[in-house]
Regions:
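Beta-rich accessory regions
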Residues: 1-201
């Protein structure tokens, strides 16, 4: 996939590029004939320092902070049981003062995966909301895989949808928070890994 550089045109000319490749993906046809996608398995070799938190409730309207889970190079795997809730999501790159954060959510009523960059950066980039069609099946858990590479954030939802953006945080925040909408959610598991560099130099 291609991730566009959302900085002003003058900066694109100065730095000499207008975007970058996203993570390599495996693509295949599902049993229903629709496209499936996930990050290639080889990326798992970059994982370091696994952390796990399992089986807890996030109340509607809460922002549940995952202390110690954040890092500037990060992979998250989040499995959520929605129950009667209408949405659930995660915020990454959260600054301590909450002025910067990038929000990723599933909206069951709108049947969308939503990437909200409205508070991603105090400085650069498009402060807008990007969405993609996505719907959970009956009784299906929400599985989000989120990758943070400093200013690049990519999310994969249940192997069926993905969004990637440059977000340009300026405050150095690495906080991670979960949230629920329209009801409480049960988080079956959150796994987090710090990621090492893919190049040895």
């Amino acid at each position: 996939s291609w991730i566009f550089d959302d900085r002003p045109d003058s900066l694109k000319k100065f730095y000499g590029w207008t975007g970058m490749y996203g993570l390599p993906r495996s693509l295949w046809a599902g049993a229903d004939g629709t496209l499936r996608m996930r990050p290639v398995k080889e990326l798992e070799t970059l994982r370091r320092k696994e952390q796990v938190k399992s089986n807890f409730i996030v109340k509607e309207g809460w922002e549940f902070k995952l202390n110690g889970f954040g890092h500037e190079l990060l992979e998250l795997e989040i499995t959520v049981q929605l129950g009667k809730a209408t949405g659930a999501g995660v915020m990454v790159d959260c600054s301590d003062d909450q002025r910067e954060q990038t929000s990723i959510a599933y909206d069951a009523s709108e049947k969308q995966l939503i990437f909200d960059a409205g508070k991603s950066s105090l400085d650069l980039g498009r402060r807008n909301i990007e969405s993609a069609p996505f719907e959970l099946k009956k009784d299906e858990n929400l599985i989000l895989r989120v990758f943070v590479d400093k200013g690049i954030v990519e999310v994969f939802a249940n192997d069926r949808q993905a969004i990637g953006r440059c977000v340009y945080p300026r405050l150095g925040g690495t906080g991670v928070k979960l949230f629920a909408k329209g009801g409480d959610i049960r988080v079956l598991s959150v796994k987090a890994w710090e990621l090492t560099a893919s190049n040895p130099y």
